[in-house]
Amino acid sequence: MPKIYRIVGETTTGMKFKIEVTAEKPYDAIEKVYSLIGSRHKLSRVQIKIREVTAVQPEEARSDSVKMLMAIDRVIKY
C-alpha cells in the first residue's frame, strides 16, 4: 500500500518547494521529486537539495490530487 510523503527542499536557483507524493518507500518518493522538479524547471539532480522527507497521514495531506489517489481502493483494467 503506498504512503504519502511530504518532501521539503530547495534548488540552487533559490526556489523552495514542499511537495506531497505517493510512494512505497522514502527513496522512491525522493526519486519522484527529482523527476518532477527536474522536468518542470529543467534542473539536474545536483541542483536539487532535499532537506526533509516525512511520512504523512492521509488526513494531513494538503494536495487534493494525492488525497484522491489514496481514496481509490482498487483499479479495474480492461
Swiss-Prot record:
GO terms for molecular function: large ribosomal subunit rRNA binding; structural constituent of ribosome. It holds the Pfam family Ribosomal_L18A. One of its GO terms (biological process) is translation. It comes from the Archaea. GO terms for cellular component: ribonucleoprotein complex; ribosome. InterPro entries: Ribosomal_eL20, Ribosomal_eL20_dom. Keywords: Ribonucleoprotein, Ribosomal protein, RNA-binding, rRNA-binding. The keyword rRNA-binding applies. Coiled coil: none annotated. Belongs to the eukaryotic ribosomal protein eL20 family. Part of the 50S ribosomal subunit. Binds 23S rRNA. This is Large ribosomal subunit protein eL20. The gene is rpl18a.
